[in-house]
């Protein structure tokens, strides 16, 4: 016989960004709890609103499955004393299992007999097991938590109610000083407290009080309502996924509506309007059929359509205040001088341990010039890089960016163009922030990419130099994101800039404002980001082998990892890698600076390998280079089959080791083959 279980936790208003992850976490923790406690079920589903987290288990068994476990104890010779009686070791073993020596039996394992006991545990009633549901709720973790009243505990928000129903039967439990019942709260303004009749009636009972418990249903309602407005008004609406996910977790009963604003505000840059609506007011942007921004917006009310016109007017009034600010800053910022703003950056702190923004820009300018050479930019591009690096942070002191910090770089580009800066310079000012997320947009221009690299490199090196190094999940200055951006830009543009040599060169630079330190840690940090970018689809041993190669060119590292991963599926992979691994291991015994002497070769297999090594010039794609190396496998095998490398003759031994070392030198640019696993 099965029943349905409902658990609802009523809370004060949750931050929108934690609602969905918390629902998912509750479902996962409940599933783990039921599995660990041997309670089977048919399905499990989550519910969430800004004021509740809930989980419903369908078809829950009314009793645990019985448990039968075998336990292996000491060997028979230890379990029995000289008189054939059970020893203290045997007695202690069974006592620890809650059994007696009468339960002991002996079983043979690999030719020797051992003590075994079998323990049977009858399944408990589901109601008894579910008494531990508060432990499931207590196990949830949140990015923030709070204390309330005089309680000693903390949680994401104060708890107001707890419901635990098994079909229609309430289980009496306590969590954070709240006793369970069947009362849930309806909509804050439209609904009332309501009694949940049963686990099955949960959604219907809440719906009667203007609460849509299913986040998926709220999302579908919002989309359908927006699409209906689109059709009626003949407009297009940008349904941004992130905004949609935020809005659906701000409301319990969604009603979408369209508002408007004075078309005069369309003269403000579109990015300002979109930021005001989307980021600050959580409004959806409206466009005409040609994609042009319209003086309208769509918002979602937490309630029904009653008095909707008043709600629309209120939202329009709030937005106009934002747009007035935007219009003012747009007008006033154009009166400012870029050079004056840049000069003032000397008084803006980049970080108290690192110095000013102006000092950061000075270092970035030097790095950018160096990178422009390394990346092979034209003279015109180098000139654009130099000018962009000289001014690229000026918009931080504009009124617009002060009010809308999301527009850093974007407004810099616009103001730069208005003052006559070259398009390449203006674009680089915007692009230097890219990518601004793990999968975010990359710079499109070489000038912008070089400036972005330089800015991120100085940021990384500066923070490391003053000891502000990320540890664990703690990364307050987003250095992992910056480094991931460095790796992605290098890969995207295919620039063959050896990172180890680049970092060496940067550490040789001299600045009055800062001395770069912790070089080894920086390189390890960059390696970790390259490893992450390779992805878990690439086997760990391949990632490690490639990262241990002698060539640290990011695009090539990524390509070689993919080539090796593909090759690992071929029959030729194992023998080739094993041959090369043997070469690597022996080559470690080679004496430095020993020249290969052909007159010391004693057989044709040595000569054949020497000829192959001498003529080996890796070229082409990573896949083609790997094929060149793997093609040496038969020659290497013949050499080992017919040649004693570690011969007693020291001169011949050193010569053979030198030959192997030369081979390693040529192929280790691909990977450290001795780190590859062929088992």
Swiss-Prot record:
Q: Which InterPro entries does the UniProt record give?
A: Gly-tRNA-synth_bsu (IPR015944), Gly-tRNA-synth_heterodimer (IPR006194)
Its main subcellular localisation, reduced to a broad class, is cytoplasm
Q: Which reaction does it catalyse?
A: tRNA(Gly) + glycine + ATP = glycyl-tRNA(Gly) + AMP + diphosphate
Q: Which GO terms of the molecular function aspect are on file?
A: ATP binding; glycine-tRNA ligase activity
Q: What class of enzyme is it?
A: ligase
Q: Which UniProt keywords apply?
A: Aminoacyl-tRNA synthetase, ATP-binding, Cytoplasm, Ligase, Nucleotide-binding, Protein biosynthesis
Keyword presence, Nucleotide-binding: yes
* HAMAP family in the record: Gly_tRNA_synth_beta (MF_00255)
Q: What's the family?
A: Belongs to the class-II aminoacyl-tRNA synthetase family.
NCBIfam families with a match to the protein in the record: glyS
Name used for this protein in its record: Glycine--tRNA ligase beta subunit
Taxonomy-wise, where does this protein's organism fall, top ranks first? Bacteria, Bacillati, Bacillota, Bacilli, Lactobacillales
């Amino acid at each position: 016989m099965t029943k349905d279980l409902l658990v609802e936790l009523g809370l004060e208003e949750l931050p929108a960004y934690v609602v969905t992850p918390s629902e998912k976490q509750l479902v996962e923790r409940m599933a783990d709890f039921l599995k660990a406690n041997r309670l089977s079920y048919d399905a499990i589903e989550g519910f969430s609103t800004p004021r509740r987290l809930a989980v419903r288990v369908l078809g829950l068994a009314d009793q645990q499955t019985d448990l039968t476990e075998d336990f292996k104890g000491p060997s028979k010779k230890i379990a029995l004393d000289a008189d054939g009686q059970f020893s203290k070791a045997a007695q202690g073993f069974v006592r620890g299992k809650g059994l007696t020596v009468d339960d002991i039996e002996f079983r043979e394992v690999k030719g020797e007999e051992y003590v075994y006991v079998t323990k049977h545990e009858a399944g408990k009633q589901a109601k008894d097991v579910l008494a531990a549901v508060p432990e499931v709720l207590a196990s949830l973790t949140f990015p923030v938590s709070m204390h309330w009243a005089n309680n000693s505990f903390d949680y994401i928000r104060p708890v107001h109610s707890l419901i635990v129903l098994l079909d229609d039967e309430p289980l009496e439990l306590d969590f954070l000083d709240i006793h369970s019942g069947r009362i849930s709260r309806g909509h804050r303004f439209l609904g009332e407290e309501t009694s949940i009749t049963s686990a099955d009636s949960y959604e219907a009972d809440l719906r009667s009080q203007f609460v849509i418990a299913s986040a998926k249903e709220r999302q579908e309602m919002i989309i359908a309502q927006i699409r209906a407005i689109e059709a009626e008004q003949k407009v297009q609406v940008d349904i941004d996924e992130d905004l949609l996910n935020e809005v659906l977790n701000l409301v319990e009963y969604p009603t979408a509506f369209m508002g408007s604003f004075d078309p005069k505000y369309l003269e403000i840059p579109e990015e300002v309007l979109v930021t005001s609506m989307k980021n600050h007011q959580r409004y959806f942007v409206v466009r005409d059929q040609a994609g042009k921004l319209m003086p309208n917006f769509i918002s979602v009310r937490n309630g029904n359509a009653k008095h909707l016109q008043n709600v629309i007017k209120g939202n329009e009034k709030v937005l106009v205040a934002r747009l007035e600010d935007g219009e003012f800053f747009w007008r006033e910022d154009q009166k400012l001088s870029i050079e004056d703003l840049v000069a003032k950056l000397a008084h803006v702190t980049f970080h108290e341990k690192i110095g000013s923004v102006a000092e950061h820009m000075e270092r970035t300018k030097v790095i950018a010039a160096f990178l422009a050479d390394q990346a092979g930019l034209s003279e015109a591009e180098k000139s654009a890089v130099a000018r962009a690096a000289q001014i690229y942070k000026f918009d931080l002191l504009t009124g617009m960016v002060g009010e809308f910090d999301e527009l850093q770089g974007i407004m810099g580009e616009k103001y730069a163009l208005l003052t006559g800066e070259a398009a390449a310079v203006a674009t680089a000012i915007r692009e230097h922030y890219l990518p601004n997320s793990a999968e975010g947009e990359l710079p499109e221009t070489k000038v912008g990419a070089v400036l972005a690299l330089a800015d991120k490199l100085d940021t990384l090196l500066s923070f490391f130099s003053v000891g502000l190094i990320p540890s664990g999940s703690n990364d307050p200055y987003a250095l992992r994101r910056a480094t991931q951006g460095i790796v992605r830009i290098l890969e995207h543009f295919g620039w063959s800039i050896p990172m180890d040599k680049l970092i060496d060169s940067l550490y040789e630079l001299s600045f009055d404002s800062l001395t770069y330190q912790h070089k080894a840690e920086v390189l390890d940090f960059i390696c970790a980001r390259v490893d992450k970018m390779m992805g878990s689809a690439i086997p760990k041993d391949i990632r490690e082998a490639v990262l241990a190669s002698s060539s640290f060119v990011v695009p090539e590292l990524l390509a070689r990892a993919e080539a090796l991963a593909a090759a690992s599926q071929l029959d030729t992979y194992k023998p080739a890698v094993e041959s090369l691994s043997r070469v690597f291991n022996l080559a470690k015994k080679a004496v430095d600076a020993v020249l290969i002497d052909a007159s010391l070769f004693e057989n044709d297999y040595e000569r054949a390998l020497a000829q192959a090594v001498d003529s080996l010039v890796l070229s082409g794609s990573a896949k083609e280079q790997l094929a060149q190396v793997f093609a040496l496998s038969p020659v290497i095998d013949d050499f080992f089959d017919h040649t004693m490398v570690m011969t007693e003759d020291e001169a011949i031994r050193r010569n053979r080791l030198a030959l192997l070392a030369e081979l390693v030198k040529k192929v280790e640019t691909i990977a450290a083959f001795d780190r590859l696993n062929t088992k």
